[in-house]
A protein has these predicted regions:
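Short, Lys/Arg-rich, polar N-terminal cytosolic tail immediately upstream
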Residues: 3-31
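C-terminal transmembrane helix and the adjacent membrane-cytosol boundary/short C-terminal tail
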Residues: 7-12, 19, 37-39, 53, ...
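Amphipathic cytosolic juxtamembrane alpha-helices at the membrane-cytosol interface
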Residues: 28-33, 170-172, 196-229
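Membrane-water interface segments at the C-terminal ends of transmembrane alpha-helices
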Residues: 32-65, 81-163, 168-193, 222, ...
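Glycine-rich helix-loop "coupling/hinge" segments at transmembrane-helix boundaries
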Residues: 65-69, 243-270
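A short amphipathic helical element positioned immediately N-terminal to and/or at the very start
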Residues: 71-80
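Cytoplasmic juxtamembrane regions at transmembrane-helix boundaries
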Residues: 108-124, 192-213, 301-307
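Loop-to-transmembrane helix entry/capping segments in MFS-fold secondary transporters
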Residues: 119, 204, 270-276
Length: 307
């Protein structure tokens, strides 16, 4: 009888001792809530110094007139009435749209290919995704520049497309934008295309629906939220691209990102007012793309929950 009594005494002593230990830990945790706030102070400093403060400066510059130095919309009026700036906005939007369409088609081809082709294509895309910016522009210059390898081959064998290809203009920019858009489009769109079910095709075939009806009345409406959300990401990615375009054409082609840089780093004098207005226009386009992506992402999530 003595051994059970001793064991019970040990259990009671451990239980009594455990309560104060647990209570002390809880009190310690309650006493140190400021530790969590201190941990995120560096993050807030980075956001304020490198995002909010420059954005506030850009917004202020954009509403201070370059000539009158008064608050107003003088800079925005200049942006949307000067042919150079309107052409820059249009060129950026047009090149972005073209690259998005071609990247979309490439992603669709990859999703329909056999597993062997898809794996090989994905392996190539993984290498392509790590090759962008200035190295990408330099590689295209070596291949298709005025004295590039493919250009010389085109001249030697009388291939007009290669011999007369203008790398330092619209065609060259579109080709390079497509190059760095295809990997991102494929990675983002393959999961969306994987949502196409065989039952949809079987049901459409039973109901004698044409291929056009199958795609435009069944597949695209069901995948539209995912597709449009991804396309908005691709569009914003191309719209804000700077390093590759600058390394290739510098300021010799009208693009929105290049014009913003030229306003702040002018050869003769700077124009922070117009540059700020152009930057706010670019930010507005990016915000629209982000809102579109968020909206369609939520719709796609609701659709998956319903299914």
């Amino acid at each position: 009888l003595s051994r059970p009594v001793v064991c019970m005494e040990n259990v009671l002593q451990q239980g009594v001792g455990a309560k104060p230990a647990t209570a002390s830990k809880a009190k310690t945790a309650k006493r140190r809530p400021w530790m969590a706030y201190i941990a995120i102070v560096p993050f807030f400093l980075v956001v304020i110094l490198y995002e909010l403060a420059p954005l506030a400066q850009l917004a202020l510059n954009s509403v201070i007139g370059r000539d009158s130095e008064a608050l107003g919309l003088e800079n925005y009026i200049r942006v949307f009435t000067t042919p150079l700036y309107t052409q820059s906005i249009w060129n950026s939007v047009w090149i972005s749209l073209l690259s998005v369409v071609v990247a979309f088609l490439a992603a669709r081809f990859c999703s329909e290919a056999s597993p062997r082709v898809r794996n090989g294509f994905t392996m190539v895309l993984n290498m392509m995704s790590n090759f962008s910016g200035v190295p990408l522009a330099f590689a295209f210059m070596i291949l298709m520049g005025n004295a590039g390898v493919l250009t010389l081959i085109g001249e030697q064998f009388n291939i007009p497309f290669l011999a007369n290809f203008n790398l330092y203009g619209f065609d060259g920019l579109v080709m390079m934008y497509i190059y760095f858009q295809i990997p991102l489009a494929t990675l983002l769109l393959i999961p969306a295309f994987a949502g196409i079910r065989k039952e949809w095709r079987e049901a459409a075939t039973i109901l004698k629906a044409s291929t056009f009806d199958y795609w435009f009345r069944i597949v695209i409406p069901n995948l539209m939220p995912s597709i449009l959300g991804t396309l908005s990401v691709l569009f914003s990615n191309a719209l804000a691209a700077y390093a590759t375009a600058y390394a290739l054409v510098m300021n010799n082609y009208a693009l929105l990102a290049l014009q913003i840089t030229s306003r702040f780093r002018g050869d003769v004098q700077t124009d922070a007012a117009t540059g700020g207005a152009l930057a706010i226009v670019l930010i507005a386009l990016m915000v629209i793309c982000t809102l579109v992506n968020n909206y369609f992402t939520r719709r796609a999530a609701k659709g998956r929950e319903i299914v």
